[in-house]
Amino acid sequence: MKFAHIADVHLGYEQYNQPWRAEDFAKAFKVIAEKAVESNADFVVIAGDLFHRSLPSPRTIKEAVETLWMFRKENIPVFAVEGNHDKTSRDISAYHLLESLGLLNVLGLRRNPVRGENVESLRIQNVYLVKGVVDDVEILGDRHRSKWQLEKVLPLLKPQSDKSVLVLHQAVKEVVDIDLDMAYELTINDLPEASYYAFGHIHLPKIYEFDGKAIAYPGSVERYDLREASKIVRYRDELVLKDGIRKGFILVKNFRPEFVEIETRELYDVEIEDESVEGLEKKFLEVLGRADKEGIMVAKLKSSDAVDVRRLSEVAAKRVRYAEIRFERILEEIEEVEIKQESEFFTEFELKLLELLRGEMDEDEVYSLVVEHYLSGGALKQEEGAEERVVEEETEKKVEEQFKGDEEADEAERRAEETEKAKSTKKARKPKTLLDFLGVEEE
């Protein structure tokens, strides 16, 4: 038993608003069909998103008919489910049009039974489960569903044969968790029994093994977005080139998957960085020189100075089929500033004065603090010599700033008079107020 597993064809997708990109997707589908026919496949499954939209254009439908006819001519039955892009809330979709032409069979729950050479309908309450049959192999499946809908639908997709294929367009948690950042609708434990799980929806080719069986995603047939680039280019200090994602389909032999690669248009994911504009442009031109002229390039350029993106885009348009260039400025790194504690700069007395400046002490407390400090020798006891005088002068300066004293000359004169008074009376006079103690006249 041999069959082709295809998914995410996205016929009609004019990527980057370029009509010729829709032609690329149609061409990829045709190449896959040719390879499937050459491999003598017994049947084909399409696991969703045959079309990019639920209402494809006449041109897109024509492209689908022409390729599916290749299978019809060889009597190779095709079984398909609708994906999230091309499903419709109506009873009839583009899939049913193709079904009426005898080009494919739509799997899943239906209001009415469908019967044919390779199709059976099983009544379940008031609906019918339409499934495919090729020799002794059952092909079951259903359209893209929400998580809560799957809870009701999956138990109905149980095979009656020992050999079966389950076709779904959903994301399985265990596969998504490998290296993809996307939501999922089900887990492996939710899946009904099957010999092979033919999935669509994830655009990167993935084959996940469990219990000797495969959950497989062939990926999209063409490069749907930048995550599916064929070449990854990084150029900072040196040029680094890496191969990207392969495109194709899966050929399944006796329920064992084998990926078959096809050639598609090159898509370059480019990031270039240089401090100078001149260096950046030189690197960009070097990368352009290596690119295929029929390829697509999406480039992010980083520099400290602004780059003329428009001019570079014009240059790139002459070297490749299509280019998108984005600029990102390199921001200077901000140095971390160490924040020191106030205690590292001020004495204990000065810290207490700071509390005054913040309005956290009343006048009586300040008065007691200053008197106690100066009567005990204050800052003069801390160190000797010139350093003592510096500390004292800085302390006096802070106090002067707090209370907005008069000019230094007047202040010195008043202190001299007070000193003479003290000598004549030989008795210390207790200051009446803090302002009086500091020699500042009250206004």
Curated annotation (Swiss-Prot):
Mn(2+) 2 binds at D49, N84, H169, H201. Its EC number is 3.1.-.-. GO terms for biological process: double-strand break repair. Binds 2 manganese ions per subunit. Nuclease activity is regulated by Rad50. Its cofactor is Mn(2+). SUPFAM superfamilies: Metallo-dependent phosphatases. InterPro entries: Calcineurin-like_PHP_ApaH (IPR004843), DNA_Repair-Maintenance_Comp (IPR050535), Metallo-depent_PP-like (IPR029052), Mre11_archaea-type (IPR032885), Mre11_N (IPR041796). Mn(2+) 1 binds at D8, H10, D49, H203. Keywords: DNA damage, DNA repair, Endonuclease, Exonuclease, Hydrolase, Manganese, Metal-binding, Nuclease. Residues 395-423 have a biased composition (Basic and acidic residues). Part of the Rad50/Mre11 complex, which is involved in the early steps of DNA double-strand break (DSB) repair. The complex may facilitate opening of the processed DNA ends to aid in the recruitment of HerA and NurA. Mre11 binds to DSB ends and has both double-stranded 3'-5' exonuclease activity and single-stranded endonuclease activity. Belongs to the MRE11/RAD32 family. This is DNA double-strand break repair protein Mre11. It comes from Archaeoglobus fulgidus (strain ATCC 49558 / DSM 4304 / JCM 9628 / NBRC 100126 / VC-16).
